[in-house]
């Protein structure tokens, strides 16, 4: 593709060279530099890849995209284009390179602090029940037409995102559904993508700190950007941040919640529990009337299901498809039951901070278990505040806690547990807990010491398939490990 075609829609200045330059692909990793490629110089939080421009030129790249001036004297044969934002330029160029695939599918984006993953899975289930062919991108990976790939970020870099959209389209997908993170919006990963439907779940303080957002207000503002890039916004009317988040929105709004003002509102919800089932059923009124049953527990599942229902209605899907899709949806690693015993209930969940842990435990407590037991750790090389917070919440809300490892990365598990212990002692000096550094041993302990009617939540890893010790990732699939142990023990 000619560079001029690649730059369509991108404001730029030609610093040197020719727009007739032929480009075979786009890269932003200097280690991949080779003839025929265009290297995008990105200013990152850790490194500025303009430092590698000369090296890439020496390796024969055909063109460079720069954001600030560099010494061009050592690269006379390379075409150089200057832009205001190299991330924004890369997003639009990537879309052009892959033929703007997002324009040829129904596009749905979901944002919020909690519930993005579950809501996207529910929407996918509803769409597929209606016969749609869906590609989905999010925290749990990329799914389309029976295939699955892992992702490094909730919202992939723009090049990978556009490449994935192309794969969706070529595989026969008619709809692309994705989690849209605040980082993805702020870093222009979704620049140039227009959504048919944008969804807002809820908002609470998160992702605030070095390399992320400076303030909660900034975080909220970036989340709100989605509603300036979609035709219809499906939003939680009950969230206290909704009005501020929607400031400057350009889309039509459809609301959901428990408020009387909601377009789709839930009433009369009932908790359902057996040893191998935790769920909820409720009635929907407003613009439509329907009974809904969901295979996931708690009030937050009601909100997630309402969001999916509203999206289905916006897209004109049949009520039966919405009902059936919600009824059969199960999300890997999100309040995922592992039915290994009739004596107790054990589940896996990705809750890995104070907010999500409190929300989960509040939900589970409502089912009145004999004991609420939590198995958890915290990630290494991350904020100590998260450890204190999770420890404090579990001490207050759980009957018994098993402190163990999560992804230790380059820290000692004993040091991480010591920080969690500080939070435990603050939350409840009388809290009952045990420390078992090896997570597999902790899982075995939880099963061995389970009592009749216990509800055991294994939190922090959820859908993850590995554990990280000293930067080395080894396979660790909690569901399989629990099932294997139950089989060894002969549990019923």
Annotate each predicted stretch with a short phrase.
Residues 1-14, 35-38, 250, 287, ...:
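ATP-dependent carboxylate-amine ligase
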Residues 1-92, 262, 269-270, 293, ...:
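N-terminal leader/targeting and accessory segments in enzymes
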Residues 7-10, 89-237, 241-249, 306, ...:
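Phosphate-binding loop of NTP-binding sites
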Residues 9, 70-76, 171, 196-346, ...:
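Acidic, Mg2+-coordinating active-site environments of NTP-dependent enzymes
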Residues 23, 35-36, 61, 77-78, ...:
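Short, well-ordered alpha-helix to beta-strand connector turns
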Residues 44-46, 182-183, 204-207, 239-240, ...:
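Short glycine-rich anion-binding loops that position phosphate/pyrophosphate groups of nucleotides
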Residues 62-68, 233-237, 375-376, 399-406:
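Short internal beta-strands
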Residues 136, 178, 198, 235, ...:
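Structural beta-sheet core signal
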């Amino acid at each position: 593709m000619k560079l001029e075609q690649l730059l369509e829609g991108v404001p730029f200045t030609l610093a040197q060279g020719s727009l007739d330059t032929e480009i075979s692909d786009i890269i932003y990793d200097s280690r991949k530099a080779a003839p025929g490629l265009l290297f995008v110089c990105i200013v990152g939080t850790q490194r500025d890849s303009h430092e590698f421009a000369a090296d890439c030129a020496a390796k024969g790249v055909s063109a460079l995209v720069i954001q600030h001036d560099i010494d061009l004297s050592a690269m006379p044969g390379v075409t150089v284009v200057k832009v205001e934002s190299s991330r924004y330029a890369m997003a639009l160029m990537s879309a052009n390179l892959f033929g703007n695939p997002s324009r040829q599918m129904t596009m749905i984006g979901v944002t919020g602090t909690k519930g993005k993953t579950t809501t996207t899975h529910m929407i996918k289930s509803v769409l597929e029940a209606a016969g749609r062919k869906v590609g989905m991108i999010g925290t749990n990976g990329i799914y389309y037409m029976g295939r699955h790939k892992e992702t490094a970020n909730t919202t992939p870099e723009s090049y990978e995102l556009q490449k994935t959209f192309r794969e969706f389209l070529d595989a026969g997908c008619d709809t692309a559904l994705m989690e849209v993170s605040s980082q993805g919006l702020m870093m222009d990963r979704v620049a140039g993508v227009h959504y048919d439907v944008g969804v807002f779940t809820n908002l609470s303080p998160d992702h605030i700190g070095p390399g992320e957002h400076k303030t909660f207000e900034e975080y909220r503002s970036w989340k709100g950007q989605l509603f300036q890039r979609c035709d219809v916004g499906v939003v939680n009317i009950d969230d206290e941040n909704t009005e501020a988040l929607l400031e400057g929105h350009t889309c039509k709004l459809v609301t959901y919640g428990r408020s009387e003002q909601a377009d789709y509102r839930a009433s009369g919800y009932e908790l359902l529990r057996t040893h191998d089932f935790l769920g909820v059923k409720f009635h929907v009124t407003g613009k439509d009337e329907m009974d809904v049953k969901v295979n996931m527990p708690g009030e937050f599942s009601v909100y997630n299901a309402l969001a999916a229902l509203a999206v289905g209605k916006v897209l004109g899907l049949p009520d039966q498809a919405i009902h059936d899709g919600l009824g059969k949806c199960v999300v890997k690693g999100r309040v995922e039951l592992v039915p290994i015993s009739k004596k107790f209930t054990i589940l896996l969940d990705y809750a890995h901070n104070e907010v999500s842990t409190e929300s989960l435990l509040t939900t589970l407590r409502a089912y009145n278990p004999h004991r609420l037991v939590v198995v958890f750790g915290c990630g290494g090389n991350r904020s100590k505040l998260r450890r204190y917070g999770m420890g404090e919440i579990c001490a207050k809300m759980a009957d018994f806690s098993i402190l163990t490892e999560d992804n230790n990365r380059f820290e000692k598990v004993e040091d991480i547990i010591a920080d969690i212990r500080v939070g435990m002692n603050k939350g409840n000096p009388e809290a009952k807990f045990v420390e078992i550094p090896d997570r597999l041993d902790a899982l075995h302990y939880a099963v061995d010491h389970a009592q009749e009617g216990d509800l055991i939540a294994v939190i922090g890893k959820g859908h993850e398939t590995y554990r990280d010790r000293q930067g080395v990732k080894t396979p660790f699939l909690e569901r399989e490990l629990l099932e294997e142990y139950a089989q060894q023990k002969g549990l019923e």
